[in-house]
């Protein structure tokens, strides 16, 4: 899938290159299946059947039923639908929400909006290593808690949580609490079990599908009130576009693209998983030669993400220096451009570590040459740039 051997792209947690097979599937769908899936005549019904197959393919990767998966425009939209949709039907018996303190903005901002409306939102800080403190999270859940939300894999540090285990403990403490999990960085990278989980978010452009498509798992029987309305929703859940969960004519080509990407990721997992683990280990070993560098990711973080701090060169300065070497990393979440990392801040890291942090994120197409180019760039940058600051 690599297009340029001199380009060392190591920011796959921000976005991934669209797989050629995915692009081909999208183009074929655009040109051959142009009918509206809601139409009752032939071309529309052909599109409906293809949409159903795409839904079934995505559902299979989650271990979900076909009727439990809904296509959306992105992971952020999925999070908004799940969070805002779950609160309204439960507000009569509770006003408390428990959420991890290092979530994606598409979770944090809806929570802030709900707090402004009078809901009690308890943010649970991560431990010093960036991992979710499951015991503290569980302790915050009480009989008034209507929603608990956390991400399975943190997008900045790669810290991961056993989502199903925590969800089941939450349900054991309060069966009425809705449990939402942001699985955008976890899907197709770590095993997914939906036990105890009411809603689960995935995104296309993290797995070599295009930007602009995601999906939302909603457990059968999980009651939500969709936050916005549109075509077909007058029929209620069980009819209309995306069964009334998300209005608008379905983006069939991108739904097919998402399903194709998920299938490719599943097929390549046996090769990709150990390969990425080896790249992560190579990077960690190489960083040991750079005494200024400290690691911010926990030891058991997913292999796809490694967060580090140079502690002497500001992130933006080092990022642009590495770019001159053909190496591309990020200073944190691409959705919070220019802002200090609230994840690293929640971990209690000192300002210098936060201001000099870099996130490296792998995909299956990365190579040892990518890692070596990054290490060489960091070594040169630390030797030259540190004297300038």
Segment roles from a protein language model:
Residues 1-389:
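Pyridoxal 5′-phosphate
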